[in-house]
């Protein structure tokens, strides 16, 4: 009996230590919650071809100054989708912008924002994607002129410009503000379109969310700070209504790429999350329109 007690006394702290170093991706994802993460992250708008595309089967063309990118198939198809990815592969893609074979993704895949997501959100999303119908849909290769087609160049780009720091709540702000900051800067990846970029495709960290003259498909994307040309005259309720039903305070309807964002993402968020986004956006320092 004494020997057993001594053994247990030794094993309990040992097991605790081992459990503390188990890889986080060993956690399990919640598919039901993952569907909500899918909506927060706006996956459908990019990974489903408009009107007649198979759900999440990719193939949507994104036209940019660097060439045309085609969004990948993220259904569980093992040949043309992500059916042979494990949880670690998926987390690495979102957190590091790397494929299962170690290749570097272009930042048209907004891992530059997704890296701020919690690992649990990533795993929940993967769990949901594992439940959708597998679709065999080979996607065209990106059509990029030299030198942008050299994928290995992304190693240097990421080394210089990629900040993979996870989101950290601000203890001086409310829970609603922190939730809004997390959604806007993490899964919602709002800055990927609403922040201006330089000639190397790097977002201007000095002018976050100040608008972008050359957004998706060459369209201008508005300033969503309270600054001149922005949404300074919008109330929090105005922001919530816009994200929920796509109508501006002056009764205009949403247009351009934001139409898909509202239909496939923000309109499906909870009232509390929409209010959290509004709380965060109305608190931002005003920045002059960058368009």
Regions found by a protein language model. Name each.
Residues 1-7:
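N-terminal secretory signal peptides that target proteins for export/translocation
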Residues 9-20:
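Bacterial N-terminal signal peptides
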Residues 21-39, 156-185, 228:
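Electrostatic cytochrome c docking/interface patches
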Residues 34, 40-50, 90, 125, ...:
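The canonical Cys-X-X-Cys-His
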Residues 61-92, 112-122, 208-249, 262-274:
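Electron-transfer interface patches adjacent to heme c in soluble/periplasmic c-type cytochromes
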Residues 88, 97, 102-106, 110-113, ...:
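Membrane-embedded segments
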Residues 137-152:
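Extended, well-folded interaction surfaces typified by the phenylalanyl-tRNA synthetase beta subunit core
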Residues 244, 256-291:
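A cross-kingdom marker for long, charged
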